[in-house]
Amino acid sequence: MAVRKEKVQPFRECGIAIAVLVGIFIGCVCTILIPNDFVNFRSSKVASASCESPERVKMFKAEFAIISEKNGELRKQVSDLTEKVRLAEQKEVIKAGPFGTVTGLQTNPTVAPDESANPRLAKLLEKVAVNKEIIVVLANNNVKPMLEVQIASVKRVGIQNYLVVPLDDSLESFCKSNEVAYYKRDPDNAIDVVGKSRRSSDVSGLKFRVLREFLQLGYGVLLSDVDIVFLQNPFGHLYRDSDVESMSDGHDNNTAYGFNDVFDDPTMTRSRTVYTNRIWVFNSGFFYLRPTLPSIELLDRVTDTLSKSGGWDQAVFNQHLFYPSHPGYTGLYASKRVMDVYEFMNSRVLFKTVRKDEEMKKLKPVIIHMNYHSDKLERMQAAVEFYVNGKQDALDRFRDGS
């Protein structure tokens, strides 16, 4: 037994030595290959997130750069293809003429009438419209007194193509009893609820949704608010050379048609002045739309913005008309014209300027829009007294403002 123990002991000691050597060898290998994980295993776990984050950021930046580059290439391809399509659709090759003879194209082609959009409205417009044009007025019972004054002025002038879109049953009955052409819409809860509102701003926003079908059917539409008196037939005073032809909120040639406005920043020293172009807004209560794609797109854009973000319809109307394309936004490519501010007259022009000028008082405007004043009905009646019945002092009792 003693001899056997003596023989086994050297082997056991040798095995232990070999195991130690193998362990040291593996430790050295691990130290060389993965020093952080081996030497500082615990701290590496704690710091793994911070070490990993910059690498992931770099990875995301690299991916973003690749995607941005591909996106730029795709955008260029779309632009090139769009230009090829435009050239293919162009019926004739256009060459620039001599200096002073070149004018851009601003009159877009009209859309092909699509009677399937609303067969019932199509049949009605065939009877009421004149030369494929129609005046459209949206109204509810809350504004009936003003509508009565307007309808009387329309009949007095002899306008035949005038159509009311009643927003409640009471006004529909009024149109029937007064033999006024009207269009009863199909039930639509989204429109019906707002249509019965007493808030004129809410009701006003509906017109952009309602007018779309008129344009789809191929009709030129002259939209009119109810606070307007007609003194002449407006269709004889339209140019029809633009997608949108609108009256202005401006009160003279500068504010209505545009002027330079100087912005002054003294901190910029010698470069302190910057010239800006300004124009007072188009009035969304009286405008003419040709049945073109840009006109329909305008209605769609305004309707979409109002439904998602709300806001005043006139502000949204002008934003889409005038804001240019810029990064993140593609502007509306619609041609536009401002109506003569003294023919299509707003109430500021009438009460602050015209009534105080003996020569200007002799001119007869096409319409008068009481958009600047809250006592609309009384001023509409006074305008009729002055321009129709010849009562020279009919306008004198009113203040310049409301």
UniProtKB/Swiss-Prot annotation:
Q: What happens when the gene is disrupted?
A: Reduced arabinose content in the insoluble cell wall fraction of meristematic region. Reduced root hair length and content of arabinosylated extensins in root cell walls.
Which residues get glycosylated?
A: N253
Enzyme Commission no: 2.4.2.-
A GO MF term? glycosyltransferase activity
- Keyword Disulfide bond present in the record's keywords: the answer is no
Report where it is expressed, by tissue: Expressed in leaf meristem and at points of cauline leaf attachments on the primary stem. Expressed at low levels in siliques.
InterPro entries the UniProt entry points to: Nucl-diP-sugar_transferase, Nucleotide-diphossugar_trans, RRA1/2/3
| Motif extent (DXD motif) | 225-227
- What GO biological process terms does the UniProt entry carry, in alphabetical order? cell wall organization; root hair cell development
**Which is one Pfam family of this protein?**
Nucleotid_trans
Q: Does the keyword Oxidoreductase apply?
A: no
- Report the transmembrane regions from the record: 14-34
Residues assigned to the Lumenal compartment are: 35-402
Cellular component per GO? Golgi membrane
Q: Where in the cell is it found?
A: Golgi apparatus membrane
Membrane topology term reads:
Single-pass type II membrane protein
Residue spans, topological domain Cytoplasmic: 1-13
Role played? Plays a role in the arabinosylation of cell wall components. Involved in the arabinosylation of extensin proteins in root hair cells. Extensins are structural glycoproteins present in cell walls and its arabinosylation is important for root hair cell development.
* Similarity comment text for this entry: Belongs to the glycosyltransferase 77 family.
Protein name, as recorded: Arabinosyltransferase RRA1
- Give the species this sequence originates from: Arabidopsis thaliana
The gene name reads RRA1
